[in-house]
């Protein structure tokens, strides 16, 4: 096996978005987790993005307690599957403490894999779910997706103003105006390996300087978005949580901070946002 150059970081990292239910991990999922541990990734949030995979995310979280946690939701690409039955299934999933956020949900007008009216309906229903979930104690956070749908996205979120818990706009790749609109709402920002892409991510290198440390989190979005700074590039092109440190390294360079400072702040922010147990309590 070819050795991959991965930055060494002492602080235990948290990957807030890894699609570990993806079938590309079916043959070596345990090895993927072992490599993540070896690269300093102590906890991972497994993204639930459709009706079929959200229950699988929960099963993974239950299989690896304290290390894996889950979200449950329906990505806009799958919006047409959000029926009454699906809504009931999602609400049942959110009764489990291992499910720590509502989503991935939102709007995607870039690819339009689902009709836009269906996307808006599914998003609205999941916002209602989020408004209902966690009462009377604490509302669960939202794990949000937005591509080329900023105006509708903001309008729909505004309709639920004051009724939702904290929110993170995952895999942020947008404009300065979008970033500041999100920060003005006190939302969090998830940064992926898009930042490491010299072809399409260079604008982010200036924008990440403006994200307060207590609003910034990191994610691989594995198996997608393999950082282009990984050397050598694996032939299979599959991203894994083990590569999370490459995002930390680029963030540190762009923000003028040390790698350890970025690692510590993003882990502390993720722990608070998802209400995770302290790292020392993780098994």
Name these PLM-found stretches.
Residues 1-283:
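Mid-domain alpha/beta scaffold segments of enzyme catalytic cores
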């Amino acid at each position: 096996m070819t050795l991959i150059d991965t930055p060494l970081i002492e602080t235990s990292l948290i990957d807030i978005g890894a699609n570990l239910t993806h079938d590309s991990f079916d043959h070596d999922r345990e090895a993927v987790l072992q490599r993540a541990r070896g690269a300093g990734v102590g906890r991972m949030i497994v993204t639930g993005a459709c009706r079929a995979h959200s229950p699988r995310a929960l099963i993974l979280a239950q299989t690896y307690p304290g290390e894996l946690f889950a979200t449950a939701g329906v990505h806009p690409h799958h919006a047409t599957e959000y029926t009454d039955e699906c809504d009931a299934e999602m609400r049942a999933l959110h009764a489990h403490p291992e499910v720590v956020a509502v989503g991935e949900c939102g709007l995607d007008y870039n690819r339009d894999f689902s009709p836009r009216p269906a996307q808006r309906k599914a998003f609205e229903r999941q916002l209602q779910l989020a408004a209902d979930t966690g009462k009377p104690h604490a509302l669960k956070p939202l794990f949000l997706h937005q591509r080329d749908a900023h105006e509708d996205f903001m309008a729909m979120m505004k309709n639920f103003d004051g009724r939702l818990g904290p929110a993170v706009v995952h895999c942020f790749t947008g404009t300065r105006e979008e970033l500041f609109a999100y920060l003005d709402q006190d939302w969090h920002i998830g940064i992926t390996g898009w930042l490491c892409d010299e072809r399409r991510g260079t604008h982010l290198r200036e924008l990440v300087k403006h994200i307060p440390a207590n609003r910034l989190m990191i994610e691989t979005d594995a198996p997608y978005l393999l950082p282009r700074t990984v050397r050598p590039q694996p032939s299979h092109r599959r991203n894994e949580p083990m590569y999370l440190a490459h995002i930390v390294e680029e963030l540190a360079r762009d923000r003028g901070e040390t790698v350890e400072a970025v690692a510590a702040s993003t882990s502390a922010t993720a722990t608070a946002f998802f209400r995770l147990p302290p790292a020392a309590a993780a098994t």
